[in-house]
Amino acid sequence: MGDKGEKESPKKGKGKRDLDDLKKEVAMTEHKMSIEEVCRKYNTDCVQGLTHSKAQEILARDGPNALTPPPTTPEWVKFCRQLFGGFSILLWIGAILCFLAYGIQAGTEDEPSNDNLYLGIVLAAVVIITGCFSYYQEAKSSKIMESFKNMVPQQALVIREGEKMQLNAEEVVVGDLVEVKGGDRVPADLRIISAHGCKVDNSSLTGESEPQTRSPDCTHDNPLETRNITFFSTNCVEGTARGVVIATGDRTVMGRIATLASGLEVGKTPIAVEIEHFIQLITGVAVFLGISFFVLSLILGYTWLEAVIFLIGIIVANVPEGLLATVTVCLTLTAKRMARKNCLVKNLEAVETLGSTSTICSDKTGTLTQNRMTVAHMWFDNQIHEADTTEDQSGTSFDKSSATWVALSHIAGLCNRAVFKGGQENVPILKRDVAGDASESALLKCIELSSGSVKVMRERNKKVAEIPFNSTNKYQLSIHETEDPNDNRYLLVMKGAPERILDRCSTILLQGKEQPLDEEMKEAFQNAYLELGGLGERVLGFCHFYLPEEQYPKGFAFDCDDVNFATDNLCFVGLMSMIDPPRAAVPDAVGKCRSAGIKVIMVTGDHPITAKAIAKGVGIISEGNETVEDIAARLNIPVSQVNPRDAKACVIHGTDLKDMSSEQIDEILQNHTEIVFARTSPQQKLIIVEGCQRQGAIVAVTGDGVNDSPALKKADIGVAMGIRGSDVSKQAADMILLDDNFASIVTGVEEGRLIFDNLKKSIAYTLTSNIPEITPFLLFIMANIPLPLGTITILCIDLGTDMVPAISLAYEAAESDIMKRQPRNPRSDKLVNERLISMAYGQIGMIQALGGFFSYFVILAENGFLPSCLVGIRLSWDDRTINDLEDSYGQQWTYEQRKVVEFTCHTAFFVSIVVVQWADLIICKTRRNSVFQQGMKNKILIFGLFEETALAAFLSYCPGMDVALRMYPLKPSWWFCAFPYSFLIFVYDEIRKLILRRNPGGWVEKETYY
C-alpha cells in the first residue's frame, strides 16, 4: 500500500474525515439548555408535542429512525477470492497449460498419452477442494450491524397534538415528545423534561454497571454523564420519564458508535500478511525457475510442446499444493484446543495474532476483577478490620466479639433495602442473586455471612418508617421496633456518605459504650476514612440512635416527608468500605505477560484512585514503582516539579487525555512501562489503541460494552467477554472469553505463539521436499538424462505422503522458552525468512536430492545403464520409434521396456523422498532444543511417520497402480538406498542445534535459526 495521500479520491477523503469526527467526544449542547430553549430549537411544544404534518415533514427530511447497515461483500466474491488467490492462481495456470499441452498433443499425435489431461484434472480438483475448505472456514462475516439491529426498540409511546399514540420506533422524529417507563428501551436520544424515579441502565454504552438516575437538571458538562439525557437503545429500568427527541438513527450516540465500528478499516491479521508474503516468495521462485528453464530448453533445441511440459513440471514441483490446507487445519486445531480452555476464537487467523501481541489494553471491571462489590474493610472501636474478599472465603477473618460490631451489623442489615431472591436456600451465600443495588447487596452478603440470617433480624426489628437515599442529603434512614419485648423505644438506623453521617453525630460507640465524639476521635475517623478511600474503596458511614420513649411513644406516627423526629446528635458506630476485588488468577497472569515481554495497560471508566488500587493489587503497577504523584508525595514537592520520566508508572485521567495531542500520547506510551487510564470514554479507548499501534505494537483489547466495539474492531485482536459482554462487543471481537477471565488471555497468547512456531516447522518440513522434486527436472533438461521423477509422482508426495506429517506438527508441544521470549516483531520476524529457505532448500533439501539420485542411479545401473552412458541419451530414450537402444552391456531395449525401468526409477525416487522426509519430520519437531530433550510424545506425529510409509508401500505394490499412477513395485533392497542420507540429515541437524544452544547469538544462530 503506497502513500495515496495526494491522489486520494474525494470519497476516501470524506470517509477519513467522518471517522475523525466520530472519534471526537460527543458534542451536544441540549443538556445545557433550558427546556424552553430545547423546544424552541426543535419547533415543538413541551405539552402538545409536534403536529402530524410537521412530523411527516421531518421524517421525509431525516429519514427513518434506524441504523444504516454497513456495505457487505457478496458471498460469491468471497468464494472467488479463495479460488483465485495466492497459490491457486499458479495451480490454475498449471492446469490450463496441462489442458493446452494435451490439446496440442491430441491434435498432432495419433495416440496421445493422457498424462497431461489427468494432471490438469488433478490440479484443478486440488484448487477447488482447498478453495472450498478455506471458504467454509472463513464463512463468518461482519455481523456487527445485525446485533445492533436486535437492540433497536420496536415501539415507542409518542405524544403528537396532545394525544398519546404507539408508533413504530422507526417513525420517531427529532422534536417528538416521547414517554418511557421501566422495562422500555429508549427509542432515540432524549432530553428529559420530566421524570419520576426514572433510572436507566447505560452499561451497554458507558460500561457503568450501576443504574443511573434521570432527571430534568443538567448535572455535568459531559453529555454522557449528565442526568438529563437518555440514549438510544439503552434500557429504562424503573420509573417514568418524558423527553424531547434530539437525535435519531445514525445521528444518535449509539448510532455514531455503530458507524464507527463498521467504518473502521480492519487491517489484515499478521498471519494473513505472513502467508501472503510467503506465497509471493514461493510464487516468485516458481515463476522465475519455470520461465528460465522454459527459455533454456527452447535454446537447447526442445520443441514448444516439450518446453511447456517442462514449465508445468517445474511449477508443480515448486508449489506446495497441500500447504494452505495444512495452515487452515493447524489454525482450526488450535481454535478447538482454545475453546476447551474457555477462549472461543471467531476468526481463525486471530489465534496467531494473539501470540504476537505486545500490548494488552484490558478493562478493569469483571476482567481483572470479580465484578461483585464486596465488603473489604471496616473501621470500628478505632481500628481497621480486614474482611475476606476471596471468591471462596479462604481469606482472613476478624474479631466479631465486640458489642460495637453487633451494633454495626444491625445497622448494615436493617438500613438496607436489598433482599435475596427466593428459592436460593441451598445456594452458597456469595453466589446468590440479590434484588438491590451493588453496595447494598455487598453489605447484605457480608452480614449474612458473619451474623446469620438478615431476614430473621428484619422480622424481629419491624420497620416502621424509612427515608430512601437521595443525592441531596446523601443518606438513607429507617426506624425500627427493637427486638427486646421489654424495651419500647424505637431504633433509628442510618447510613450514608461518611462525612455527612459524622456531622449528625455527637457521640461514638467504643467497645459497646457511648463516648463523646471529641476532636481526637474526629481525627481518627478522618485518618481511617482517607486510608480506606486511598485504597480505592467506596466508604459508607453508619450511626444509630434509640429514640426516647417519652417523646416517641409506641405507635407514634413518623412523617418522612416533613420530618418530625430527631436526625442529629446521633451515635456514630463505624465505617464499612467496599471494593470489586481482583480475580485470584490475575496477578499470576499479569506476571506471565511481563516475562513474555507484553505490556499490560488498564483502561477503565472507573475512578483513578480505585483504578490505581486494583492496578497495584494485580501487579499492573508492580511493587516499588511510583507514579508522579507518589514521587511528589514522598519528596514533599508539587507534582509540577517532578520529571515525568522518573516515574515508571502513571495514572492518566480521561479529562486530561481529552486535551492531549497524538505526540503527547506517544510520549506517555514510550516513557512509562506501567500505565493506567481512568475515567475514559469509548472514543478515548480507540485513541489509546491507535496510539499503541503507532508505536508498532500489536494490540489486544478486552471489552464488554457497546462502547468498546470500535476499539475491539480497531485492535489487532479484540477480546470480548462471554458472560457480561453485550452482543455488539461479541460481534466486533475476534475472540470471546467464555469465563470473562483475564488469565484466559495469557493461555491464548501461549497458544498463539505455539501455532506460529508450529506453522514454521510445518512449512520448513513441506518446503524441504521441493528440492528433490525440482532437481530431477533440472538435470533432465541440462544433462539430457531420462526423467528421474514424474509430475504425477510429485503430486503423490505433496498431496499424499507429506500431508499427515505436516499437519501432525501442529500437535507438537511448546518448546521450553516459549513464554520467556519477547513478542515477535512483525516487521523483521517473518513466518518464512531467508534462514528457513536456506535451511530447507540449501542444506537439508540438497541432502534429500542426493538420496533420491542415488536410488535412481542404482536402479538404472542394476538394469545395465551405468551413469556414464546416461548423459545425452534422452532423445533416443523418449523416441517411440527406437526399439533397439543399447545399454552399457550391449543389451537392446524396446521403448516399452525402457519406460518400465524409467517408471520404476520414479517410484524409487518417490520412496527415497519419503525415507529422507522421516528424518526431516523428526528434526522439524524443534527449532532450538534437541529432539532428545523434546521427546517423542506427539502421537499424531508417530502416526504420520507410519502413515506416509504405509501410503508409499501401498502406491508401490498395489496392483493396478502401474496403469493409474505409473508406480511399479520395488525390490526391497532399493528401499534402503536413501537410509544413509536420512541418518546424515538427523546427525547434521542435531549438531547444528547443539552449536546453537552453546553459542546463543553466534554465527550459526544468525545464519540458520529460523
From Swiss-Prot:
EC number(s) recorded for this UniProt protein: 7.2.2.13
SMART domains registered for this protein in UniProt: Cation_ATPase_N
GO function term, MF aspect, one: ATP binding
Amino acids binding Mg(2+): D704, D708
Gene Ontology annotations of biological process type: intracellular potassium ion homeostasis; intracellular sodium ion homeostasis; potassium ion import across plasma membrane; proton transmembrane transport; sodium ion export across plasma membrane
Function: This is the catalytic component of the active enzyme, which catalyzes the hydrolysis of ATP coupled with the exchange of sodium and potassium ions across the plasma membrane. This action creates the electrochemical gradient of sodium and potassium ions, providing the energy for active transport of various nutrients.
The name this protein goes by in its record: Sodium/potassium-transporting ATPase subunit alpha-3
Organism whose genome encodes this protein: Gallus gallus
